[in-house]
Amino acid sequence: MSKVRPYVVGRLRKEVLGRSYIGGIVTSREGDGSYNRVLAADANLVIAEHLQVGAMLARSFEPAAGGERWVRHAAAQWRDDFLQAGFTVLDISPDFNPGVGFVMRRERMMGGSVALRPRPSSQLVRQFEISSSLVYFHDDERNLMTRRATVRLGTFFESGDQIRLDLKNRVEVLERPFAISRSPEVMLAEGRHEWSSVNLELRTFNGRTVQGTLSGEIGDFWTGTKRSVSVSGNARPNPNLSLEPSYSFNDVDLPEGSFTTHLVGLRTNFSVTADLLTSVFVQYNSSGDLAAVQVRLNYIFRQIDNVYVVYNVTRFTDGVYDGLSNSSLVLKVTYSLHR
C-alpha cells in the first residue's frame, strides 16, 4: 500500500529599504509516527547600487535527534555592466534533515567567481565575456572532497544570439566505491579523480518565434572519456501556446565499463486566459529507466498573487524497480500582505 505523508511549507517575506528583503521559512512533515520541522531566516540586502549581500540560517527538528542540525549560508555579489564578482560560503551540518526536499551533500562549500564584460565598438558584437569560477567542497577536517573550476569565453551579438566556450576542470575524492551507472553496472574505485573537458554552446535570441540552444562537450571523465550533445528549443505557434522540447545524449567510455544515456523532455505551456496558465512537462531518463510527468495550474487572482496546483508523478519503467512510482499533489498560495 502506498504511504501518504502530508507536509506544509510556509514562506513570509517583507521588502525593506527599497530593493532588499528579510524573510522566514517553516516546513513541517508528518508520517510514520514521527515528524520533521525546519525553521529558517534569510535576508538579501542591496547596500549599494551594484552590491548585494545575503545570508540564511536554518535548523531542523526531529524527535530524539542529536548532533549538529544547522545550515549557515552567506554571500556577497557585485554586478555592473562591466564587472561581475561574487563569493559564497555554505555550511551544512551532518545531522541536518530538511524533511521536505533533500540535501545533495552535507559538507562545507566555498565558491567565488569574477567576470569582465567589455563592450566593443562594433556593429556585430554587443558584449564579450571573460569569466572564471571556482567551487570548493571540504569535510570538517578541511580535506578536499570536490573542486570545480571553469573559465568561460563568451560573445553576445547585436542580434541577441550568443556563443560560449567553457574550459572545465574537476576533482572528486571518493571515500568509497561509487556506482556511476546501474544499467549496465559500472563501479568507480575510491580515491582522487581529476579530469578536464571543453564545452561549446550556441544560443539563438529568445525573442524569436522559434529559438534554440545547441551544446556539445568532449574531454576526460573520471577514469575515461565522455562525449555529450544537448539540444533544446522554444516554439511559439501563437501567443497562448509554447512548446519547449529538449534532448541530451552522453557517450561514456571508462576502463570499468562503457554506457550511453538519453534524456528526453517536452514542456507545453498554454494560457487559457491572461489569469489562468497551465503547463505539462513530460520527461524520460534512460539511465534510470525513469519517466516523469508534471502538471501545473497557475491562477493569478491578483497582481503578483497566485494560486498554484501541481501534480507530480514518477515511475520506473524497467529494471529491479519496474512498476514502482511516486506521486505528489502540491498547493501553493502567494499573497502580499502589504500593497
What are these language model-derived features?
Residues 1-34, 42:
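A conserved hydrophobic secondary-structure block that centers on an alpha-helix together
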Residues 7-9, 21, 40, 197-199, ...:
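Short glycine-rich loop/turn motifs
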Residues 14-18, 47, 157:
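Short, solvent-exposed loop/edge-beta patches enriched in aromatic
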Residues 33-36, 44-46, 52-62:
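Extended, well-ordered alpha-helical scaffold/bundle regions in very large, multi-domain proteins
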Residues 56-339:
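Exposed, low-structure sequence patches enriched in small/polar residues
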